């Protein structure tokens, strides 16, 4: 077996740490460089991960330096944020170094710019998989698997729900209160919900004001919530990989309603040009921190995702829904993608999304191997089919 070296960007962060723990379990990985700017945190993570890990002080924005570092590794795995600051420099550095690459990218606008680097990556012999986490990532592959249920598909809808306050929100507010750090995940939420956003209708992308296009959705608990279109990479990549599908949308609902109003109030300020994404996120976290008793009481399950497709099977119209169960993870798919590339199982070269290069079921089964023991008896995903 060929022993390989991994450069993990964002190695001191939440997602990077868990990806590192998965990667070091593989005999194929001989070394993993945890890269970032916070040297003290990196040293702490190295001690936690073990003998295969070492720290690599580097600023992702310094593309030349990062490319020089990356040349010594077999793959660059990017779990750093915020995404609009880290994804493009990291991908460019990997291409310059001639090193394979994968990331957690969930910013649609950045994903489009990454895809523009496809020819450069091919010229350098680089395989670069973008957006391979939970969503995007697992959901893209669920779509490819679900397409087999139909003879033809009319519409694909990605439904995202964020039930708050969850554990990650509490972490974000605590970090803001103690160090004024503005959580990059919440910056991503603000960036994705601000208008205008795109939907894919009748084979074309069109821009809409999300608050003018709300739809009522029945949630898993039977309640009805209003969901709004949201900008997401799935909306960009699925139509490219499945051109026969002419309608794709991503919709998003936040509960409770008071939290949703607060998020969209800040998002509208961004859209009007009054504040930046980071400033809006800071204002949002400040509001929560000032009145914890109101905003942060109780504990909600957090993020939920499901895919709903309508189409035709044997001459009958049907609606199919599917959702992750045992494969509900962000960091594990990133690690599995890296290992798949390192094994040589991705023959393509260029920049592409996961649905273009991974076989869904075998990928899901490998992800499931890294899930906690208490989840091993659960199904990989849930599904339902309704004839219309």
Predicted regions mapped to residue ranges:
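Short beta-strand element of Class I
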Residues: 31-33
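Conserved Rossmann-fold cofactor-binding substructure of NAD(P)-dependent oxidoreductases
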Residues: 58-73, 82
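N-terminal Rossmann-like NAD(P) cofactor-binding module of classical short-chain dehydrogenase/reductase
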Residues: 73-79, 101-102
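ADP-ribose/adenylate-binding Rossmann-like module
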Residues: 93-111
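C-terminal catalytic/substrate-binding lobe primarily of soluble NAD(P)-dependent oxidoreductases
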Residues: 149-388
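N-terminal Rossmann NAD(P)H-binding glycine-rich loop of SDR-like oxidoreductase domains
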Residues: 6-22
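Rossmann-fold NAD(P)-binding glycine/threonine-rich loop
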Residues: 105-127
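N-terminal Rossmann-fold cofactor-binding loop
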Residues: 35-39, 59-60
């Amino acid at each position: 077996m060929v022993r390989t070296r991994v450069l993990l960007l964002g190695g001191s962060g939440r997602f990077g740490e868990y990806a590192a723990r998965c990667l070091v379990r593989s005999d194929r990985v001989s070394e993993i460089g945890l890269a970032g700017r916070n040297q003290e945190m990196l040293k702490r993570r190295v001690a936690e991960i073990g003998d295969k890990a070492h720290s690599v002080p580097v600023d992702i924005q310094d593309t030349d330096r990062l490319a020089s570092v990356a040349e010594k590794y077999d793959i660059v795995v990017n779990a750093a944020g915020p995404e609009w600051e880290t994804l493009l420099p990291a991908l460019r550095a990997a291409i310059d170094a001639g090193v394979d690459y994968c990331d957690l990218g969930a910013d649609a606008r950045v994903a489009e710019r990454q895809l523009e680097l496809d020819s450069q990556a091919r010229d350098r012999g680089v395989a670069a998989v973008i957006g391979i986490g939970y969503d995007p990532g697992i959901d893209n592959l669920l779509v490819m698997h679900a397409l087999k249920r139909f003879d033809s598909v009319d519409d694909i809808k990605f439904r995202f729900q964020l039930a708050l306050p969850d554990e990650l929100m509490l972490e974000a507010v605590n970090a803001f209160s103690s160090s004024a750090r503005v959580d990059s995940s919440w910056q991503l939420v603000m960036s994705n919900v601000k208008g205008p956003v795109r939907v894919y209708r009748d084979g074309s992308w069109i821009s809409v004001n999300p608050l003018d296009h709300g739809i009522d959705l029945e949630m898993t608990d039977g309640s009805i919530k209003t969901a709004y279109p949201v900008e997401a990479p799935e909306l960009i990549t699925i139509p490219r990989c499945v051109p026969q599908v002419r309608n794709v949308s991503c919709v998003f609902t936040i509960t409770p309603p008071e939290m949703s109003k607060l998020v969209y109030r800040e998002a509208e300020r961004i859209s009007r040009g009054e504040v930046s994404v980071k400033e809006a996120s800071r204002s949002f976290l400040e509001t929560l921190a000032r009145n914890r008793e109101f905003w942060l009481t109780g504990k909600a399950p957090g993020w939920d995702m499901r895919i709903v497709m309508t189409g035709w099977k044997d001459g009958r119209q049907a609606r199919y829904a599917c959702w992750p169960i045992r494969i509900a993870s962000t960091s594990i798919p990133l690690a599995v993608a890296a290992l798949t590339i390192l094994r040589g199982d991705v023959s393509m070269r260029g920049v592409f999304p996961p649905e273009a290069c991974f076989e869904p079921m075998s990928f899901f089964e490998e992800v499931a191997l890294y899930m906690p023991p208490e989840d091993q008896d659960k199904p990989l995903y849930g599904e339902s089919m309704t004839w219309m």
